[in-house]
């Protein structure tokens, strides 16, 4: 416990320089993580409880790349207006990390703005079955992108929170966008597991660790992304869930 607390203190000190922007919409918060990389957090209610959803956007010399989308269409315009106000650039690309509304919900909106929209073929198949708006462009599980002066990689680690969850890696900044396969350090459980593959989840997390051993920051999909124990905590939550399931059988 003491070791964990010391680690959290060091990490907290590392975040003291984060710049938080004041937004007109109280359900949107934007924080600068790296030179051109920003974490945006939006809030919505699920089964009567308010949750935070985290994702990132990258400002490039060509325009803004948005990973996932604000959680709730009532926040879409406020979000893109805020981006243009801060950076004087438009969103030119949007990538959904899986099919749920807090990730793929903005595909149609961003597409109408003229942005190129992307998802994996697996995510596209799920969205098609659910009669939901889909990305214009699809790719197999893994893909490297270069937008202007920025390179990043989409990686499929395996099943976990959903069958189609992917993560996004920004190598220059050593930032991993974990999406919902990575639980925040303050999560009490695995959250919504109605479409989860819990027995595959551990290996998928190990695949992430092996693929990206030099991560500096992990942005978890929900709640406190600044607690950088999220990867290990996710493994602990999976183990706890499996032990409880075994005990109940």
From Swiss-Prot:
Gene3D superfamilies: Ribonuclease Z/Hydroxyacylglutathione hydrolase-like
Amino acids binding Zn(2+) 2: 102, 180, 222
GO biological process: antibiotic catabolic process; response to antibiotic
Keyword Zinc: yes
InterPro entries recorded: Beta-lactamase_class-B_CS (IPR001018), Metallo-B-lactamas (IPR001279), NDM-1-like (IPR050855), RibonucZ/Hydroxyglut_hydro (IPR036866)
Cleaved signal peptide residues: 1-22
Binding-site list for Zn(2+) 1: 98, 100, 161
First-tier enzyme category under EC: hydrolase
Superkingdom of origin: Bacteria
Family: Belongs to the metallo-beta-lactamase superfamily. Class-B beta-lactamase family.
Function statement: Confers resistance to the different beta-lactams antibiotics (penicillin, cephalosporin and carbapenem) via the hydrolysis of the beta-lactam ring.
NCBIfam families associated with the record: bla_class_B_core, bla_subclass_B1, blaB, blaB-IND-MUS
Record's protein name: Metallo-beta-lactamase type 2
